[in-house]
Amino acid sequence: MTFAITQARLRASLPAISLVAVLVPIVLLQPATMSYFGSGLLLNLAVPIVLATLAQLAIITVNDLDLSIGPFVSLVACIGATLLVKQPWLGALALAGCVLAYAAVGALIELRQIPSIVVTLGLAFVWSGLAIVLLPSPGGTSPEWIGTAMAYQTPWIAAPIVWSVLIAVIGHLLLMRTSAGVRIRGAGGNPRAMRRFGWSLVRSKATLYGIAGVFGVLSGLSLLGLTTSADANLALRYTLLSIAAVILGGGEFVGGRVSVVGAVLGAITLTLASSFLSFLNISSDWQVGMQGAILIVVLSLRVLLQRGDRQ
């Protein structure tokens, strides 16, 4: 019994262990990264990735997978760099429409029982096409209020760390500690039981897809505030990054088993790995390989621990 509890705790702590394993060599090679300025520079792009990861987590909660979150974040950035600057009301309306479209897709997937991978793969091309129509070439500019918000400096601790912690705490409380969060997770954990209790799976899935849309919008706007311009291909890699971060954080594709805190730690771990390799002037191709290697190692450890539990 005690051994099983220890195994479970070790498995739950894998996201934190992964973060420490990546952080230690960074600190040893570049001690300045622990300073206020260094940590801010190292985690400069963490907030958009964390928000995109939570968007993916909302979809994985109901046993689905979103292959369109990267193009969606890029589209939001393009809307922010064009419509939101020239005609703020139209830009806000377009962003609201994007969120409603996400919710409608969730309802459609449940109503027609269509595989989410097929729908979101098609949706990825739709988002990319709209982004290219809005911004055929890189350009545009960030609205002043977004740039100001993303440039805000918190005292003592670098802003990306503060925002990531706040996002993790608020997300954990809402999804794991509220009755609404339990019901929503139940749609992925035990949908038959939810039907017997009279809860609408269509509504639950539409709600989670809508939440994913909100996080996607926040991710795109925060990324625009950091880059100050947009591009239709700005965040394409966020699709795989977000999936990897959720899985790295302890999430599973079935059963509604997700961890908000773990997903945030996973996103930060992948961001650190990418930033560290950039500091070493290593090609971006190797950065993707490094992130994949981290994911494989953590998943292998998780499988070993699960086998230990069964034995």
Give the label of every model feature segment.
Residues 1-28, 169-171, 189-203, 273-311:
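Cytosolic-side transmembrane-helix boundaries in multi-pass membrane proteins
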Residues 13-17, 42, 50, 71-75, ...:
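Hydrophobic alpha-helical transmembrane segments
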Residues 21-86, 109-112, 245-260, 293:
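Single transmembrane alpha-helix segments in multi-pass membrane proteins
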Residues 31-41, 131-136, 175-176, 212-246, ...:
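Inter-helical junctions in multi-pass inner-membrane proteins, predominant
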Residues 87-124, 266:
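Alpha-helical transmembrane segments within multi-pass membrane transporters and channels
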Residues 94, 100-105, 109, 156-230:
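Helix-loop-helix "hairpin" substructures at the membrane interface of multi-pass membrane proteins
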Residues 112, 116-177, 204-207, 226-235, ...:
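Transmembrane helix-bundle core of multi-pass membrane transporters
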Residues 216, 226-292:
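Transmembrane alpha-helical segments in multi-pass inner-membrane proteins
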